[in-house]
A protein has these predicted regions:
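Bacterial N-terminal signal peptides that target proteins for export
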Residues: 2-16
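N-terminal signal peptide c-region/cleavage motif recognized by signal peptidases
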Residues: 24-26
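N-terminal (or domain-start) structured segment
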Residues: 29-120, 159-161, 167, 182-210, ...
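An extracytoplasmic/periplasmic, membrane-proximal ligand-sensing/linker region
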Residues: 35-37, 181-184, 268-329
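Short coil/turn segments
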Residues: 45-47, 101-102, 130, 138-143, ...
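Hinge/capping helix and adjacent helix->loop/strand transition within the periplasmic-binding protein
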Residues: 61, 88-94, 109-196, 208, ...
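C-terminal lobe and pocket-closing loops
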Residues: 215-283, 312-315
């Protein structure tokens, strides 16, 4: 019995030391985070405002973290490809997802099924920006304002076309919502990304597109005509362009929120470090200036704030999709 007691005592001591060493190792690993570059997956092709915004925050988060934050564009399938990549990545903080109201709003609302859960498979880090889309058309469209465009579209069903970044994209959803709200029939033409879609509008092959602050030089040069913004207030980048509400399309306000998330299960200490870096980046004057130029309004805040924004977007866009009879694909 005595020998057995000594054996158990030694076993307990060895086990206790092992646990201490394990806890110490995990603690040290988290304290040293990050010790290598971080990948920020953007589920869009290069060139769109989401890509531009992601590169801005990545640059300034790199400075705050002392490690490069590298943008990895994984566009396609209405953001599903990039989202699934991150959802199935190791939960160690080294693979992040740039999220917005499409990844966690319009896309789930327009999808029959998904290979991942947009809420349970991701851990919110921080809200970043919000902006409003702007309805743009090729100058060949003769209408001078939204009401004239609506009248023309009703008299000429399917003659006007709307370029989208793909089925289930924000362009697709907002365009479908506009058709439903106004009773028009503007035909959607899907592309693989916002860049190719915009090029065909500029070339006159497609009538219209929903754009953002990146389009300001094109509007100023007369290459695109700006009709209305889809936000709650006028866009500071386009102060002379009315909102949809001001233009007589009542209840049409769909601001697009941006944030960063990680795979579910990422350690709390790692999430806290990333949240602090994101909020530090948002305070930088250079970032704030660039955001203003693009029409990006700065959010900032806690993981809980982003979770709230995501849940509100999911509920809002699901309700709109149902009421507007927007089909699931």
């Amino acid at each position: 019995m005595k020998i057995k007691s000594i054996s158990l005592g030694r076993t307990f001591s060895i086990t206790f030391v092992s646990v201490l060493l394990s806890v110490s190792f995990i603690s040290n690993a988290q304290e040293k985070f990050p010790n290598k570059p971080i990948k920020l997956v953007v589920p869009y092709a290069p060139g769109a405002i989401t890509d531009t915004a992601a590169r801005i925050i990545a640059e300034h988060m790199s400075n705050a973290l002392g490690q490069p934050v590298v943008v990895d564009n994984r566009g396609g399938a209405g953001t599903r490809i990039g989202m699934q990549l991150v959802a199935t990545s190791p939960a160690d903080g080294y693979t992040l997802l740039y999220v917005n109201s499409i990844t966690h709003g319009t896309m789930p609302a327009m999808s029959k099924s998904l290979a991942f859960d947009p809420v349970k498979d991701f851990a919110p880090i921080a809200p970043l920006f919000w902006y409003a889309n702007i309805f743009l058309c090729n100058p060949s469209v003769s209408a001078k304002n939204i009401q004239e465009l609506i009248t023309f579209a009703k008299q000429n069903p399917d003659k006007l076309t709307n370029a989208t970044a793909g089925p289930g994209s924000g362009h697709d959803f907002i365009g479908s919502f506009f058709n439903s709200m106004t009773g028009v029939k503007i035909l959607h033409v899907h592309y693989k990304g916002g860049g190719p879609a915009l090029q065909d509008v500029l070339a006159g092959h497609i009538s219209c597109i929903y754009g953002d602050g990146n389009a300001k030089p094109l509007v100023d040069a007369g290459k695109l005509k700006a009709f209305a913004t889809a936000g709650p207030a006028r866009d500071p980048v386009f102060p002379n362009v009315p909102t949809m509400e001001e233009s007589g399309v009542k209840g049409f306000s769909l601001p697009i929120n941006h944030g960063i998330a990680a795979p579910a299960g990422t350690p709390a200490a790692v999430l806290a470090r990333l949240n602090a870096a994101a909020n530090e980046a948002l305070k930088q004057p250079a970032l704030q200036q660039r955001a203003r130029e693009l029409g990006l309004n700065i959010y900032g805040g806690s993981p809980e704030k982003l979770a709230q924004v995501i849940n509100e977007d999911l509920a809002k866009f699901a309700k709109i999709a149902k009421e507007a009879n927007i089909p699931k694909e």
